Amino acid sequence: MSETTGASYAAAGVDIEAGDRAVELMKEWVKKTQRPEVLGGLGGFAGLFDASALKRYERPLLASATDGVGTKVDIARQLGVYDTIGHDLVAMVMDDIVVCGAEPLFMTDYICVGKVHPERVAAIVKGIAEGCVLAGCALVGGETAEHPGLLGPDDFDVAGAGTGVVEAERLLGPDRIRTGDAVIAMAASGLHSNGYSLVRHVLLNQAGLSLDAEIAELGRTLGAELLEPTKIYSLDCLALTRTTEVHAFSHVTGGGLAANLARVIPDTLHATVDRSTWTPAPIFDLVGTTGQVERLELEKTLNMGVGMIAIVPQESADVALTTLADRGVEAWVAGEITDRADHTTGAELVGDYARA
């Protein structure tokens, strides 16, 4: 009688050895993110962070956020470039946390793949680790899940969760904002990580453009433009809180500039942002003109060139701009805070964009 071979995890499409190989490849990158408070190494059941380090706080508040990168991952997949998408993930998570004035402490990641390609997974984690360094936080753990049959062998998605801390009396938000405050815009590095479903639909599906196509107005290939990593503002925002008074931050993500700014404006006040104070990068015009997308639709989908907003007292604006300039962050006064009066929303864009 011949011996039969039963079912196995490997036969079902899950390669544990490939997963182990990926962990070995990513270890050196994870080590580079470590802070003094982190205990243990990669491979434990849980990441450990020594909370006694928070004793210096009078009343520490922990801030947490969870996010992903959205359909930008498909651009990375098509280009075969996996080591930048991690920057986007850290930006989406940690720049949400810093909005309340919190210092990023640590984060974890979740990578879901159809098939574990160890080098690809390690490249993704490399990008996450680099992003963590830029945000000043530690990468204390993560999960790589292989889902054969649910995802194609080249498909993947990434998500992450992070934690930060802020002194209770230094918590930023709507209650600090006053009439006359200046609205300072910080330039985006590009599309960042929002609106890619629209961008892909317009440029790739409707217009049939190739990611390898050289686009004159962009000065590089379309793929390079679309994969440009999201700028991470965490340490720049914290530097701002040390050099001048800050009332609030707003991270410009899904929903656009006005909608995200309105999230931090109290019911009695209104933020007016003047479009004439900046010129959006060519990619925004390319999407708009190619897809005949109305300006308001673009503005509620894309960041239009502004990735982070700081609201500061008018008299602090110059110091704030100097601080950001010293850190290499392009920034400008884009508007002001006024009484709500007859305005039905917390924030609006007015005027027309400056021409290049």
Where are these regions (language model features)?
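Short helix/loop capping segments that flank catalytic or ligand/cofactor-binding pockets
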Residues: 57-58, 72-73, 193-195, 260-261, ...
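Residue-level signature of catalytic and energy-coupling elements of molecular machines
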Residues: 15, 67, 180, 251, ...
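Glycine-/charge-enriched secondary-structure boundary and capping motifs
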Residues: 2-11, 120-138, 151-156, 210, ...
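Short, acidic (Asp/Glu-rich) active-site segment that either coordinates a divalent metal cofactor
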Residues: 66, 157, 170-218, 222, ...
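Hydrophobic face of alpha-helices
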Residues: 23, 122-125, 196
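Glycine-rich phosphate/pyrophosphate-binding loop regions near the starts of catalytic domains
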Residues: 28-189, 352
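N-terminal amphipathic/basic leader segments beginning at the initiator methionine
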Residues: 2-39
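Buried hydrophobic packing segments
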Residues: 26, 48-51, 93-94, 199-202, ...
